[in-house]
Regions:
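Short amphipathic alpha-helix that is part of the acyltransferase structural core
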Residues: 1-47, 51-58, 62-65
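Acyl-donor binding region in acyl/amide transferases
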Residues: 63-155
């Protein structure tokens, strides 16, 4: 199904390519998963010319609104940060997470398709606020100075 395909892509990107360390169950299933997946919506970019459904999913985002967060027991971001001020906002919330794109598809076109899908979702669900976690590749602060500076000043 679509969630399995999304989890398979996430596994390939996060664990095979970026060398994150999976749990034993994740490694055995070759899937990146958690308890939030079944409650959330999953946005997929599919290249129909690729053979096999799992291989055809080349981009993904996980999306969660208040309704899905209630089913999941909260927002994923709340497991990492205090987001009480965000949750207190009036209007519909959208948490974006677990985004990744297959290596050969990291182009402006693939990201444009993902953001077009997110925009449609935002309008469809009347989203007022968007938030989420993001990972930066690496541990050297000198190499990450530019994105960290941007987040410090504008995040």
């Amino acid at each position: 199904n679509e969630i399995d395909a999304s989890q398979a892509l996430r596994y390939r990107v996060f664990y095979d390519e970026m060398n994150a360390i999976p749990s034993r169950e994740m490694a055995a299933r070759r899937r990146d998963f958690d308890n939030f997946d079944s409650a959330c919506d999953h946005l997929l970019v599919i290249d129909s010319s690729r053979v096999g459904f799992y291989e055809s999913v080349v981009g993904t985002y996980r999306l969660s609104r208040r309704e899905t967060a209630i089913r999941a027991g909260g927002f994923y971001t709340a497991s990492e940060y205090d987001i009480g001020d965000i949750i207190a906002q009036k209007g519909e919330l959208l948490e974006l997470g677990r985004s990744c794109v297959a290596k050969d598809y990291r182009t402006g076109h693939t990201m444009a398709l993902l953001w077009r899908g997110i925009a449609a979702y935002v309008f469809s669900h009347e989203i007022a606020w968007i938030f989420g976690c993001a990972s930066l590749s690496g541990t050297n602060p000198d190499e990450l100075a530019l994105p960290l500076s941007y987040l410090h000043h504008f995040g």
